[in-house]
């Protein structure tokens, strides 16, 4: 059990830190939602690669469950979308939904293709 908790925890700490740093790196002139969009797109792309290339169970725990689970954020996406709706910005809310969903699906597919190619 501990042999699973350690890699999971390390990955989660690294993923949360990466998301925080990514949000800090987004220029203030962009929407606050941009950092989470980039985090979700990055996670979608990497999960495709890792799903095809990582076989060891503890590395999967570290990279997929821990790191990518903390890097990506459905709750942040949900809050941003609802906030846009509450601010009477339905077009921005719909754009946010589309960009997160379509972008993540496309990047996961691309990551799977790349992961298969390098396997």
From Swiss-Prot:
Spans traversing the lipid bilayer: 5-25, 30-50, 59-79, 92-112
Gene Ontology terms: biological process: cellular detoxification of fluoride
Protein name, entry field: Fluoride-specific ion channel FluC
Annotated catalysed reactions: fluoride(in) = fluoride(out)
Keywords on record: Cell inner membrane, Cell membrane, Ion channel, Ion transport, Membrane, Metal-binding, Sodium, Transmembrane, Transmembrane helix, Transport
Function, as annotated: Fluoride-specific ion channel. Important for reducing fluoride concentration in the cell, thus reducing its toxicity.
Stated regulation of activity: Na(+) is not transported, but it plays an essential structural role and its presence is essential for fluoride channel function.
GO molecular function: fluoride channel activity; metal ion binding
Record localization: Cell inner membrane
Positions of Na(+) binding: 69, 72
GO CC terms in record: plasma membrane
Family: Belongs to the fluoride channel Fluc/FEX (TC 1.A.43) family.
Topology relative to the membrane: Multi-pass membrane protein
PANTHER family, per the entry: FLUORIDE EXPORT PROTEIN 1-RELATED (PTHR28259:SF1)
Pfam families with a match to the protein in the record: CRCB
Organism for this UniProt entry: Neisseria meningitidis serogroup A / serotype 4A (strain DSM 15465 / Z2491)
């Amino acid at each position: 059990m501990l042999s699973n908790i350690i890699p999971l925890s390390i990955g989660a700490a690294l993923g949360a830190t990466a998301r925080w740093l990514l949000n800090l790196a987004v220029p203030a002139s962009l929407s606050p939602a941009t950092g989470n969009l980039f985090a979700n797109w990055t996670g979608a792309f990497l999960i495709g690669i890792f799903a095809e290339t990582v076989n060891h169970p503890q590395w999967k725990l570290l990279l997929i469950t821990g790191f990518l689970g903390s890097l990506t954020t459905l709750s942040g996406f949900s809050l941003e979308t609802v906030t846009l709706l509450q601010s009477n910005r339905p077009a921005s809310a719909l754009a946010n939904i589309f960009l997160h969903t379509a972008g993540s699906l496309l990047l996961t597919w691309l990551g799977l293709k790349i992961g298969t190619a390098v396997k």
